[in-house]
Amino acid sequence: MATTASNHYNLLGSGSSIVHADPGGMQQAQSYRDAQTLVQSDYTLQSNGHPLSHAHQWITALSHGDGAPWATSPLGQQDIKPTVQSSRDELHGSGTLQHQSRAPHLVHPAHGNHHGPGAWRSTGSTHLSSMASSNGQGLLYSQPSFTVNGMINPGSGQGMHHHGLRDSHDDHHGDHGHQQPSQTQQQQQQHSQLQGGHHDHSDEDTPTSDDLEQFAKQFKQRRIKLGFTQADVGLALGTLYGNVFSQTTICRFEALQLSFKNMCKLKPLLNKWLEEADSSSGSPTSIDKIAAQGRKRKKRTSIEVSVKGALESHFLKCPKPAAQEITSLADSLQLEKEVVRVWFCNRRQKEKRMTPPGGTIPGAEDVYGASRDTPPHLGVQTSVQ
């Protein structure tokens, strides 16, 4: 590889007439070799004592010189791994030969006698491009900084002459990187504080499921004791507070069958109604007037067990009594006539639900006008042979 690089530089020097065999040029080369000796001693590795490659020292010398024409080479940005052991052995074996062939090329453009830095840049770029395309291995001149044992540092994608720009660029981005997270953290902290305050406030106002269950139980007991129906409560809420609720909604609230959200909305309204009803108990208030206006049907009458037993015994004798019988029965039981009539209607409907299809209903013989002993659907039974 070193021989190939040397041949290319010999062709380049002969074609471009860059090499001049004048005494001044030889003195410049000699001074360059002395400088290289000093640079080589400065860049000796501390781990194994082997100096860096001559090509890398040449890159370092150019980066600190005045010309520095290789700073804009596109191949200097590439991270190319050479064959470490073979390249290092060849470079150590032929270091003096490369210095003698490359010294005039390196020193000459610094004085600018025939070619300026632009010519060196264009010629060097063309030469390195041709070598990169023809040779399978990477170029030694475009290698970045080496670490121990000649391995390429994976973090150094650029040459050493770009360290200053790269460091300043990293510092600039580092400042922005530190500023952006700090601003983001401040915004997140403010947002979390707002959310935390909101959640604390909502948690204090929102009742738990146990609170709702306890309130529903107390509300039902107080409502029944005060003598109001579920429909009365729904109508009173609509008239007093502007939210009309049906009897079904109040029933589902007492049975804990509403959603948690709807239970939480309905609880404060029912609590206000309950407080007003408790404070006005014993005197006619607006709630009583509203309940009286809203009642389209009578209250449900609760019948005592003894009275219900007397009605049951009379139903077994006559499921459908006449009007005179209903009146006499109501007077004997101290009930309203309408209450007794409704009770017999409901009892007959219950008996229909309890009787299987094709069965008989107690008292049906009276409906059809037959005697109790011989129902119409029962005839003389004959044995089947």
UniProtKB/Swiss-Prot annotation:
What molecular function terms (GO) are annotated for this protein? DNA-binding transcription factor activity, RNA polymerase II-specific; RNA polymerase II cis-regulatory region sequence-specific DNA binding
> Would I find DNA-binding among this entry's keywords?
yes
Q: Where is the composition biased (Low complexity)?
A: 179-196
Which segments show compositional bias classed as Basic and acidic residues? 165-178
What keywords sit in the KW lines? Developmental protein, DNA-binding, Homeobox, Nucleus, Transcription, Transcription regulation
Instruction: Tell me where it resides.
Output: Nucleus
List residues of the POU-specific domain: 204-278
Q: Which GO terms describe its biological process?
A: brain development; regulation of transcription by RNA polymerase II
The record's region (Disordered) falls at 106-136, 149-209, 351-385
Cellular component GO terms held in the UniProt record: nucleus
Q: Which PANTHER family match?
A: POU DOMAIN, POU DOMAIN, CLASS 3, TRANSCRIPTION FACTOR 2
Please explain the role this protein plays, according to its UniProt record.
Transcription factor that may be implicated in patterning of the central nervous system during early development.
Official protein name in the record: POU domain, class 3, transcription factor 2-B
Q: Which organism is it from?
A: Xenopus laevis (African clawed frog)
Name of encoding gene: pou3f2-b
